[in-house]
Amino acid sequence: MQRTKEAVKASDGNLLGDPGRIPLSKRESIKWQRPRFTRQALMRCCLIKWILSSAAPQGSDSSDSELELSTVRHQPEGLDQLQAQTKFTKKELQSLYRGFKNECPTGLVDEDTFKLIYSQFFPQGDATTYAHFLFNAFDADGNGAIHFEDFVVGLSILLRGTVHEKLKWAFNLYDINKDGCITKEEMLAIMKSIYDMMGRHTYPILREDAPLEHVERFFQKMDRNQDGVVTIDEFLETCQKDENIMNSMQLFENVI
């Protein structure tokens, strides 16, 4: 039964409430399902917390409604266009932008700022390396800065995207050098960075070789032709057929 509880917790990413409240008769049959993203779930996201903590009180500021700010160096796209590109409502986009411009008046987030955000939310470990990888995943055009558009499009996929969209985004995160495939070295670097960020005071205590074991299991399932790399097709096909992998993918939502 302990294994079942852990599986439920992994599958919902702590977004569906306390698994202990699920009737015993139903726990064994629980399958992975798309999380229901409630307000509480959104508030568990580090980047959402960072932005909303800086958001000014709601008001009639017309600059928010049109996503305009004369002092910024980078002007974001219009509200209607961003709403069409994402799955956020106008009010959600306004709140996100309000916090974004308060924290980043230039309209851009650089990598040092991004690392600082994660160091604040994960003080028990070293979030520097993971923040670096995540920054590169959000920085869609690779120019060394995250625009508001990059920010909300990425969050929209992670929080409200389809399974296919989330998996493609995760593949891009793992594919560090962006050559279209994932190597064991790339996967190991990502896994080590996550373990480093979570710190040594996790429960249960993780062995030092845990990241390597995770990678080896990953490649045994993913690398269908045994050529030492995982392609996007192998990644998508295997993930969507393997419940355990899909469960583990949901854990990303706790460290975004």
UniProtKB/Swiss-Prot annotation:
User: Under the GO molecular function aspect, what terms does this record hold?
Assistant: calcium ion binding; calcium-dependent protein binding; core promoter sequence-specific DNA binding; DNA binding; magnesium ion binding; potassium channel activity; potassium channel regulator activity; protein homodimerization activity
Q: What is its main location?
A: cytoplasm
Q: What is one GO cellular-component annotation here?
A: voltage-gated potassium channel complex
Top-level division of the source organism's lineage: Eukaryota
Provide the topology term for how it sits in the membrane.
Answer: Lipid-anchor
Which consequence is recorded for altering E234Q? Abolishes calcium-binding
Q: Gene3D superfamilies under this entry?
A: EF-hand
Tell me the keywords, alphabetical order.
Answer: Apoptosis, Calcium, Cell membrane, Cytoplasm, Endoplasmic reticulum, Golgi apparatus, Ion channel, Ion transport, Isopeptide bond, Lipoprotein, Membrane, Metal-binding, Nucleus, Palmitate, Phosphoprotein, Potassium, Potassium channel, Potassium transport, Repeat, Repressor, Transcription, Transcription regulation, Transport, Ubl conjugation, Voltage-gated channel
SUPFAM superfamilies with a match to the protein in the record: EF-hand (SSF47473)
Which positions carry the signal peptide feature in this UniProt record? Answer: none
The disulfide bonds in this chain are none
Q: Where is this region: Disordered?
A: 1-22
**Outcome of altering N14S?**
In strain: 129/Ola, BALB/c and FVB/NJ
Q: Show where the EF-hand domain sits.
A: 67-123, 126-161, 162-197, 210-245
User: Could you share any additional remarks the record makes about this protein?
Assistant: Mice deficient for Csen show a significant decrease of amyloid-beta protein 40 and beta-amyloid protein 42, and display markedly reduced responses in models of acute thermal, mechanical, and visceral pain.
Per the entry, what this protein does is: Calcium-dependent transcriptional repressor that binds to the DRE element of genes including PDYN and FOS. Affinity for DNA is reduced upon binding to calcium and enhanced by binding to magnesium. Seems to be involved in nociception. Regulatory subunit of Kv4/D (Shal)-type voltage-gated rapidly inactivating A-type potassium channels, such as KCND2/Kv4.2 and KCND3/Kv4.3. Modulates channel expression at the cell membrane, gating characteristics, inactivation kinetics and rate of recovery from inactivation in a calcium-dependent and isoform-specific manner.
The name of this protein is: Calsenilin
The organism encoding this protein is: Mus musculus
Gene, per the UniProt record:
Kcnip3
